C-alpha cells in the first residue's frame, strides 16, 4: 500500500516537475487537480441514480445549457468588440447575472436530487463505466481547469501565480465539498468499482487457493492435523488475497509511471524540450527569436496539470472511495513540492559530478 502511494505521488511529482523544471512555472494548485481526478473516478464509475435524474435531472441540464450560452456570449463579445471599459463592465454584468440565473434555475432540481435517499445516494451518480477510464477523464478535467487558469493567470509574476493557483485549488475543493448533488459532498462516495479482483472472490477461487498452497507448502507440511492444516491454509489465502490485489494495483501504477517517464524523457531531449529550456532560461531572448512564450507556457501548464489529474484518479481507484474532506494542501501540494525540490537537487548534484 505504501509502495502504491509512492507510485501515485511520483506521478504527481512528474506533473509538477514538468511545469517547474521545463518552464519555471510555480503551480501550488496540485491539490485541486488531484481532487478533479478523484471526481472523474466518481463520475465515470458510479452507476447513474435513475430516481435522482427523474427528480431534478432536467433542471441540472438546463443550468448546464445556460453555462454554455453564457460562455459563448462572452466569447462573442471578446472577439467582436475592442478592449474598453464598456466591454469589461458588460462581461462582468453577464457573469453576475448568468450565475444568479443558473443558480435560480438549478436550485429546485438540486434540492430534489439531494432529497433522494440522502443516506445512500442523494446525488446524480455517474456513467457506470470501468473506473480505469477515469484516468483519462481525470486528465481532461485537470487539463481543462489548467487551460482556464492559464488563460487568466499565467501573465502574473511567479509569486502571484503561486498564490492564485493555491486559492483556485481551495475554491475547487470548496465546490466539491458543498455540491452534494454532484459528489455527495462530505458524506463521501464509497464502494467504487475496481480494476483489480476483490479479495473475497479470490479466496473462493480454486486456482488462487492452489497457488497459495504451493507457495506455503513447506509450512503446511509441518502441520499433521488436517483441521489445523486447513485453518492455516485459510489464513494464508486471506493474507495472500490482500497481497495479490495490492500487487495488481502496483502493476497498473508501474505501467503508468514507466510510460510517463519515457514520454517526459523523450520530450525533454526533443527540439520542443530544448525550446522550453531556452524559454525557461531567458524568456526575452526566446521571444526575440520568434517563439510564442505565452502559448508554450500555457501548453506546459496544461500538460503538467493533466498528469496530476491522472494521479488523482489513480488514488481514488486504489482507495475505492472519494472523500473530499481529505484533500489538504500539506499532503497534496506542499509535500509534492518537497519531492520536486529534492529531485531537482539530486539531479543537479549528479550533473555536477
Regions found by a protein language model. Give the residues of each.
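Transmembrane alpha-helices and adjacent helix-loop boundaries
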Residues: 1-349
Amino acid at each position: 500500500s505504501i509502495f502504491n502511494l509512492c507510485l501515485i505521488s511520483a506521478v504527481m511529482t512528474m506533473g509538477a516537475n514538468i511545469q517547474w523544471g521545463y518552464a519555471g512555472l510555480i503551480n501550488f494548485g496540485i491539490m485541486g487537480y488531484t481532487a478533479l481526478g478523484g471526481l472523474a473516478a466518481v463520475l465515470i464509475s458510479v452507476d447513474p441514480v435513475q430516481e435522482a435524474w427523474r427528480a431534478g435531472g432536467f433542471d441540472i441540464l438546463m443550468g448546464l445549457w445556460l453555462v454554455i450560452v453564457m460562455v459563448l456570449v462572452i466569447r462573442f463579445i471578446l472577439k467582436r468588440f475592442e478592449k474598453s471599459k464598456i466591454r469589461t463592465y458588460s462581461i462582468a454584468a453577464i457573469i453576475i447575472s448568468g450565475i444568479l440565473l443558473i443558480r435560480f434555475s438549478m436550485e429546485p432540481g438540486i434540492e430534489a436530487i439531494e432529497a433522494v435517499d440522502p443516506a445512500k445516494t442523494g446525488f446524480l451518480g455517474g456513467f457506470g463505466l470501468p473506473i480505469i477510464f477515469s484516468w483519462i477523464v481525470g486528465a481532461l478535467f485537470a487539463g481543462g481547469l489548467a487551460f482556464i487558469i492559464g488563460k487568466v493567470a499565467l501573465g502574473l509574476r511567479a509569486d502571484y501565480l503561486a498564490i492564485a493557483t493555491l486559492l483556485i485549488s481551495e475554491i475547487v475543493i470548496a465546490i466539491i465539498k458543498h455540491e452534494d448533488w454532484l459528489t455527495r459532498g462530505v458524506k463521501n462516495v464509497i464502494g467504487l468499482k475496481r480494476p483489480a479482483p476483490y479479495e473475497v472472490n479470490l479466496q473462493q477461487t480454486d486456482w488462487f487457493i492452489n497457488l497459495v498452497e504451493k507457495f506455503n507448502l513447506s509450512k503446511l507440511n509441518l502441520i499433521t492435523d488436517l483441521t489445523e492444516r486447513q485453518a492455516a491454509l485459510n489464513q494464508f489465502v486471506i493474507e495472500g488475497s490482500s497481497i495479490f490485489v495490492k500487487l495488481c494495483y502496483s502493476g497498473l501504477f508501474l505501467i503508468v509511471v514507466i510510460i510517463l517517464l519515457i514520454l517526459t524523457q523523450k520530450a525533454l531531449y526533443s527540439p520542443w524540450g530544448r525550446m522550453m529550456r531556452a524559454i525557461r532560461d531567458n524568456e526575452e531572448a526566446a521571444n526575440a527569436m520568434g517563439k510564442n512564450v505565452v502559448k508554450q507556457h500555457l501548453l506546459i501548464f496544461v500538460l503538467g496539470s493533466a498528469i496530476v489529474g491522472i494521479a488523482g484518479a489513480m488514488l481514488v481507484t486504489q482507495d475505492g472511495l472519494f472523500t473530499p474532506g481529505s484533500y489538504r494542501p500539506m499532503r497534496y501540494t506542499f509535500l509534492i513540492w518537497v519531492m520536486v525540490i529534492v529531485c531537482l537537487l539530486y539531479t543537479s548534484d549528479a550533473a555536477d559530478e
